[in-house]
Amino acid sequence: MAEAHQAVAFQFTVTPDGIDLRLSHEALKQICLSGLHSWKKKFIRFKNGIITGVFPANPSSWLIVVVGVISSMHAKVDPSLGMIAKISRTLDTTGRMSSQTKNIVSGVLFGTGLWVAVIMTMRYSLKVLLSYHGWMFAEHGKMSRSTKIWMAMVKVLSGRKPMLYSFQTSLPRLPVPAVKDTVSRYLESVRPLMKEEDFQRMTALAQDFAVNLGPKLQWYLKLKSWWATNYVSDWWEEYIYLRGRGPLMVNSNYYAMEMLYITPTHIQAARAGNTIHAILLYRRTLDREELKPIRLLGSTIPLCSAQWERLFNTSRIPGEETDTIQHIKDSRHIVVYHRGRYFKVWLYHDGRLLRPRELEQQMQQILDDPSEPQPGEAKLAALTAADRVPWAKCRQTYFARGKNKQSLDAVEKAAFFVTLDESEQGYREEDPEASIDSYAKSLLHGRCFDRWFDKSITFVVFKNSKIGINAEHSWADAPVVGHLWEYVMATDVFQLGYSEDGHCKGDTNPNIPKPTRLQWDIPGECQEVIDASLSSASLLANDVDLHSFPFDSFGKGLIKKCRTSPDAFIQLALQLAHYKDMGKFCLTYEASMTRLFREGRTETVRSCTMESCNFVQAMMDPKSTAEQRLKLFKIACEKHQHLYRLAMTGAGIDRHLFCLYVVSKYLAVDSPFLKEVLSEPWRLSTSQTPQQQVELFDFEKNPDYVSCGGGFGPVADDGYGVSYIIVGENFIHFHISSKFSSPETDSHRFGKHLRQAMMDIITLFGLTINSKK
C-alpha cells in the first residue's frame, strides 16, 4: 500500500554487490516538517510563557525601564538612591571591568530588579482588587461610584490584550468560610425539607459539630488553603470523579447537541471534514493561548482559565482503586470509529493542518472501507461504558503489551475521538418530540460501544450529518466544552461553509496518506469481559428516560420585562413543576461556578428554600391572589440570586462540608453530622448551559441557528436531572432525564409540568407571549 511505503523513511537490502539503500524522500520530508512543527510549538510555548510570566506588564516594558534608568544615570541623576553604586562595587572585586561597563551592568541589573518589583506590585494590586466581590451584591442596573472607580483600576491593571492564562497568577484563592456560617446556611437550606422533629435532631448534630469537631477539621483545611492553589479542586477531582467505580456513561459523562432546525449539508463525510477542521482551528488557537479569557461585568472581571489546559489530547485511564487523567502536550492524530473498526487519521501534511476537503476525503475513505471488524474489535469501547474495575483489570491483562498496547495508545493519545455513526438523528418535523429525545439519548450513551467514554471529548457525526459531543467530566466542567462547541458550530456554517453540492470547499489531495486500521489481538477471555460490560452498560442505558424539548413560548426577553433574573425564574418554575409532579419538595442542586478564584470549578446552589416553597404553596393554593403570589415570587427570586452570589464568591455550603469530610477521613475521626449531610440524595439536579460567545453570530438575524445545549443523566435513581440553555431573547431548551425503573418519575410528565409552570408564572405579570414581539 502507498501509505505504508510513505511511512518508511528508508529501506535496505543485502545483495551480492553490497547493501542497497533506498531513501523515501517523501517520508524524510514529512519527518523534517514534523520536527519543524514541533520546534515551532515549543517556541510558541516559550514565548507565551514569558508574556504570561511578566503580566500585567509586557516584555518590551523591560527595555523602557532599563533605558530610562541608564539615561538618568548619564544625566547624573541617581534613581536608585545609591543602590546602583552598591551594585557596581560588588560586581568586580578584581578591577578588570571598566567603570563604564560596571555602570551599564549595574544600571541594567537595577532596572531589571525595579521592573520585576513593579510587576509584582501590579500583580498583587490586581489580586487585591479581584478579591472584592461587593459588585455582585449591588442592585441590578445601579453601580456605585466606588464600584466604578474599582472597575477602572482593574481595567488599568489588566493590560490591553491579555492572553488566555494571563490572569492566573492574579486571581485570588478560594476563601475558606467559617464553620459556624456554613453550618447555619446548611440548616437554613434543609428547614423546608424536614419535619420539626427531624430538624431539631439535625440542629443538635450541627451545633455539636460547629463547636467541637468542626474547628479542628477547619484548622487543617485552612492550612491546606494557604499551601494549595485551591483547597477544593484537587480533592473534588479525585474523590468525586476519579475514585468513582461506577460507569462513566450516563452517570458522569454529559452531551452537547447542535443546531435544532438547520443542517448545512447532508453529506456525512463533508460535515465531519468541516467540523473536525473547526475543532482543530480552536485547538491551534488554544495552543497559542490566543483565546480571550472570559470576563464578567462588561469584560472586566476575569474567570479562571485553568480548565482549558486538558481539553484536547486527554484521556481518563482506569485503575482498580482510582483512575488517572493522562494529558500529553501535543497529538498529531485522531482516532475514528466506524462500523466496528478503528482508524488512525493524521491531522498534518506538509507541515500544516489538513484542510476541510482533505479531511472529508479521509472520512469518505473510512466510510467506503469494506473491511470487517477484527474479533472483539466492534464492541471494544463497551469496556469504557461499564464499571471501572473490570476495565482496569482487563486493560492491565490484555492491553499492556504488543499490538493491543500500540492501538490503545493511539486511542488514548489522540487529540480527540470521532464516531462516524451509522444512525440518523436530529429534529424531524413529522415526529419532533421523539426525534429530539432519540438524538439526545444517542449522544448520551449511543449503543454503549460506539463512544470512547474515557476520552475528554468524543465527537459524533451521524449518517445524516447531524453532529454532537459526548464529554468526560473529570478534567473540566461543561462551560469549557460549551465554549468549544459554540466556536465549532459558528465556524462550520459562517466561516468555512460548503459548496453548492454539499461538499467542503477546496480540492482533494491524492498525496495524503490514507487512514490506517488499528490492529487488535483480543483473546476470547477478553471478549467475555467486553460482552459482560456491554450487557451491564445496556441495562443502564435502556433505563434512561430522556426528554429534550424546545420552549419557544417566550424567553429571556419577556422574563427581563418581569425585572427578574432568567435563571431565578426558571429555577422557581422547576420548583413549581417538581411539586406538581411529586406533590412534595426535595433537596435541589443547581451548579454554580467558582471560577472567580484560581482553579475554581463548581459550587452548589441549594435552590429549594423556604421562600421558594412559600411561593409554590401559594401557586397551588386556589385561595391565594395573584398579588400574593407575585410578592412571594419576587422574594423567592431575590433569595435565589443571593444564594447564587454567595456560591460564586466562595461562601457556598457543600464544597466546604465536602472538604471537612475529607479531612475527617484523613484524621480517622467520625462525624455523624458530615456523614448524614453527604449521604442526602439530590432528587432534583439542575444546571444552566451558558451562552458565552454571543459575538460569533447574530441570533436575532439567524433564529434557526440556535443550539439545543446539552444534558446529563439523573443523579438519583428516583430523581430528575434537568439542564437548560437560554438562547437569544425568545428561546429556551430543556433536557430532562430520569429512570424508567423508578415508579415515581416520568421525564415527559415532568416536561409537561415544567411548560405549564413557566406559563403560570409569566401570567402573574399580566404579560402574554405576544409581549416578546
From Swiss-Prot:
Q: Fill in the domain comment.
A: A conformation change in the N-terminal region spanning the first 42 residues plays an important role in the regulation of enzyme activity by malonyl-CoA.
What superkingdom does the record give? Eukaryota
Q: What happens when you mutate residue 3 to R?
A: Decreases susceptibility to inhibition by malonyl-CoA
Write the protein's name: Carnitine O-palmitoyltransferase 1, liver isoform
**Which parts of the chain does the record assign to the membrane side Mitochondrial intermembrane?**
74-102
Catalysed reactions listed for this entry: (R)-carnitine + hexadecanoyl-CoA = O-hexadecanoyl-(R)-carnitine + CoA; succinyl-CoA + L-lysyl-[protein] = N(6)-succinyl-L-lysyl-[protein] + CoA + H(+)
Q: Which family does it belong to?
A: Belongs to the carnitine/choline acetyltransferase family.
